[in-house]
Amino acid sequence: ILGSNYALLRPEFHQIRDRVLSRRSSNTRSMVKNILISIGSSDPYNITLKVLRSIKLLKINVNIVVVLGSCAPYLNTIREYAQCNTQIKLLVDVNNMANLMSDADMAIGAGGVSSLERCCLGLPSLTIVTAKNQVSLAKNLLENKCHTVVSFSNKLDSYKITLGIEELYKNYRLRISMSKNSPKVCDGKGGARVVKAVD
């Protein structure tokens, strides 16, 4: 069973989906106030730091929530960076990702299932492909104008990330378009479809 229609998201994404999408569609605020950064639980390449430095370079005055797992090899580096910047709130081993996505105006996140979680809640996103198995989905999201995408490589530089963040942050119409397009890709009911398919 393949495809985003069968993505196994946690139940809370479907539970809050209608409320979140309704709020996004009626939101007339053109400015971004809250940015969520989640480049996977471990983020072994420390892409999170590149993202934070890009935001600093752009002089974006917003609230930033960074999510990492306790297993992240660069956790202490990010913790030290956050301690020097009152904009940044670092959260470790969270169990309320749906609510964090609900509160965000835009996100910078990894590809894979987490990108479908963002789609489910209509969260405008810059998706950073961090593994080969994420390429196909990321390409689909880009073609359907759901997310903007930066492909990861060993030579991934902050310049590409900075441009992607700047475009998403400044372009209100782009964010509105993403909020409309991305929920069509994933509705959070994949678990129910899987159960029905195997019965």
Where are these regions (language model features)?
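Glycosyltransferase donor-sugar binding loop
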Residues: 64-75
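C-terminal alpha-helical cap of glycosyltransferases
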Residues: 187-199
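Short acidic alpha-helix that forms the nucleotide-activated donor recognition element
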Residues: 92-104, 119-120
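Acidic donor-binding loop of glycosyltransferase active sites
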Residues: 102-113
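A short, well-ordered alpha-helix in the C-terminal region of glycosyltransferases
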Residues: 167, 174-188
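Nucleotide-activated donor-binding/catalytic signature segment of Leloir-type glycosyltransferases, i.e.
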Residues: 77-93
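A nucleotide-sugar donor-handling region in carbohydrate enzymes
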Residues: 1-46, 75
